[in-house]
Regions:
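Surface-exposed loop/edge segments in extracytoplasmic proteins
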Residues: 1, 89-97
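Structural beta-strand segments of beta-rich domains
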Residues: 68-72, 168-172
Length: 174
């Protein structure tokens, strides 16, 4: 059939550095005729990197920011435009496409942030480059969407400032 195979030991493969190698095979038949074939193989084990920019300007999503949704963005290294970044936050997954300047961005809807609730959590991002190597990064953030409690008590005993009270100091409490 003309097919053949050889097993290269793992120790020999792992000893190869990052480079392009030529694999050459030769055969000689019983009549002394020989043939040689070569094929280039690239060794690329470098993992891409992913960074996540500061979220909500201080890594704390407050009530107003939670209500507006948030953009989570960052950069990659060792990847290329068109590669996909996968972001997880609060058990949900979002995807972004790496842009020409190696940046990426996902929009997290307000409903998703509000469903997570308050607390500390980690944003995780990963990217797989064109040769199948995967790198990841993370950033710790806090969701603090509790609105502060505030009340104003009844003013002037009846919420009406009369002519007598109008000429006096007025104490407002809450």
């Amino acid at each position: 059939s003309g097919n053949w195979s050889v097993t290269v030991p793992a120790s020999a493969v792992s000893a190869l550095g990052e480079a392009t190698y030529s694999v050459t095979a030769s055969v000689t038949n019983a009549q002394g005729n020989s043939s040689t074939a070569s094929h280039n193989v690239q060794v690329n084990t470098a993992l891409p990197g992913v960074t996540i920019n500061v979220v909500a300007s201080d890594d704390i999503i407050n009530a107003a920011e939670a209500g507006a949704g948030q953009s989570i963005s960052g950069q990659v290294t060792g990847a290329a435009a068109g590669d996909t970044v996968t972001v997880t936050l609060g058990g949900k997954t979002y995807t972004a496409t790496v842009q020409g300047n190696l940046s990426w961005s996902v929009d997290v809807p307000a409903a998703d942030i509000q469903a997570i609730g308050n607390g500390d959590l980690t944003v995780n991002a990963s990217v797989t480059n064109g040769v199948g190597n995967t790198g990841s990064g993370s950033r710790d953030i806090t969701i603090d969407a509790n609105l502060p409690g505030l009340r104003v008590d009844t003013v002037a005993g009846d919420d009406v400032v009369n002519s007598i009270e109008h000429s006096q100091a007025l104490v407002i409490t809450g």
